[in-house]
Amino acid sequence: MADSNELKNPNKYFVLFIVSLGTVLSGYVASSLDIALSNIMNTFGFTMDNVTWVLLAYMIPYGATLPIMGKLGDQFGRKKMYVLGLIVFTAATMMVGLSWSSSTVILFRMFQGMGAAMFFPNAMTLVSDAFPPNERGQALGMWGAFAAAGAVLGPTIGGYIVEYLNWRMLFNSIVPIAAVGIVLSIMVLKESDTISSKKIDYLGGLFLVSSLSSLIIALNKGSKEGWTSLYIVGLFICTVLSLLAFLYVESRTAEPLVDLELFRNGTFTAANIVGFLTFMALNGGLFLIPFFLRNILGYTPIRAGVSLFPLIGSMIILAPLGGKLADKAGGKIPTVLGMTILSIALYSFHTMTDQTAYLPIALRLILMGIGLALTMSPLSTAAMATLPKEKAGVGSGVFNLFKNVGGSVGIAILGTLLDQRQIFHTQILSDYVNASSDAAQHFLSSIQAGLILNGMQTNEAYVVALSTLKGIVAKQAAVMAYGDVFQATAALAALGIIAGMLIKDVKKPVPQEPVVSDAEEVVPVGIH
């Protein structure tokens, strides 16, 4: 079967390249925005609230519409949705670079998120269409590694562009590459043969978007507004009520947007839980590590971005191995093994200090990359293998939704935890090391004496010495807080191990397959 499939799909690696191109570009643009934000602020006089909405403008349409876009791919064709999404994303990216006000930046960022949501879930099925069943895991592993590569290239290449050119070039520079990707997609990609019912559940979609939008805003605004503020509590209430309304509509409509029967599938449900926990830990970790490198170790933004290369390098090299293991042994074993390695890697970060050299950090990042490489594609295989092909698009949309929400929850909760633990450790250390303690007096006297020898007045020298002591306390409190939160990310990954044990591998069917085109044999899997 593999041989015949290969004969029918001679362009399978070209398809993988084309789909990976769009995925890399979206990850690159999304991650490089952090580098450009301060420059955008200066150009348009952004307030911090404007900056938050620049981020949310992408996250809300992307996260809230993933299942809808997957469903539309099932209904109207996955190639159509992929190409249309890439066109929308490219045009919006170009317009962000040409923006003339803060409002237009936010508006075009919304279209960016919408375009990414259109092509991402459908990209998975296009890769699956191009490869025979015994190679799909490996192919999706490679695709997933390139998806992660885009996220790491943003802070590095994007950092150089922002520093030596300008922030507008960050967005406009990808347009020619994306245009080539659009043309190649139209010429090479094949449309999916299976198109489901054209009926669209608009009411269910409305409630789903309302629920997820409220949740994303609440998670990202909660720390600033206060988790118990009327605004945030109201958003959480809206989230719950909209979700209940969505479940009610979906359980009673003949053509639901998300077939709730999917969650009767224990393996699909378990894989979604693992995906949620994995991205909660992963996004939390990737949020913390660059901040640790910059704020604690004093790395420049570009150096901090380049420092993540061992992570992406190990992922790219080993992702095909994770896919091969999934093809041969099923998704459960490599998923559990990968989550175990990921948990160990995240836990090892808690021992870092302000004196940690780069080599030990690089080794930790490599271990983290190995864990992710073994987890991602096998987990996607496990999530999607038992779903009927006509529900593959919406299934991959739901799977990506769980990962996306998990990532948002992880950043919000772990970011808040970091602030709380830093306050806690600052208080403890300040009580222990105060101006009246013997240790503090000895330190202050030493610093003060050195400053006086250099010609500083006694009172001024004391103020500088005291400020230095407070800075040391604050830095050590921050190091300890980072350590606590890294342990929390490891615990989340460990919970993923438990959920992974609930996955049941599906035995591959033997020659009961009808003699149809390979595109009809798709068992799509995916990774974000």
Walk through the language-model features, giving the residues of each:
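Transmembrane core module of solute transporters
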Residues: K12-L66, T104, F146, L165-N166, ...
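Helix-loop-helix hairpins in multi-pass membrane proteins, especially solute transporters
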Residues: L66-G204, L230-Y231
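Symmetry-related core transmembrane helices of the 12-TM Major Facilitator Superfamily/SLC fold
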Residues: F171-I186, L235-T239, D484-M501
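Helix-loop junctions on the cytosolic side of multi-pass membrane transporters
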Residues: V183-Y202, Y248-L257, F424, L502-P511
